[in-house]
UniProtKB/Swiss-Prot annotation:
PROSITE patterns: EF_HAND_1 (PS00018), EF_HAND_2 (PS50222)
Protein name (database record): Polcalcin Syr v 3
Chaperone in keyword set: no
Keywords: Allergen, Calcium, Metal-binding, Repeat
CDD domains the UniProt entry points to: EFh (cd00051)
GO molecular function, one term: calcium ion binding
Binding site for Ca(2+) 2: 51, 53, 55, 62
Domain of life: Eukaryota
Organism: Syringa vulgaris (Common lilac)
SMART domains linked to this entry: EFh
Pfam families per record: EF-hand_7
Length: 81
């Protein structure tokens, strides 16, 4: 479990470019662009799905919940990062 959390923290920090402890839509978009083409609509859909409290940012807790529900996707992202 501790290894899983450490890996998620590592990935989260890659997305959290300014280190403020949350991922904005622009940080999400910039990081996803390194993985390939992504549209603004796709970024907004992802934000809406992951940002469960609707504050406009993805917290580590929200990221962790999303990662656990989508472990295959996160494993693929981990391989890239």
């Amino acid at each position: 479990m501790a290894e899983e959390v450490a890996e998620l923290e590592r990935i989260f920090k890659r997305f959290d470019a300014n280190g403020d402890g949350k991922i904005s839509s622009s940080e999400l978009g910039e990081t996803l662009k390194t993985l390939g083409s992504v549209t603004p609509e796709e970024i907004q859909r992802m934000m809406a799905e992951i940002d469960t409290d609707g504050d406009g940012f993805i917290s580590f807790e929200e990221f962790k919940d999303f990662a656990r529900a989508n472990s295959g996707l996160i494993k693929d992202v981990a391989k890239i990062f």
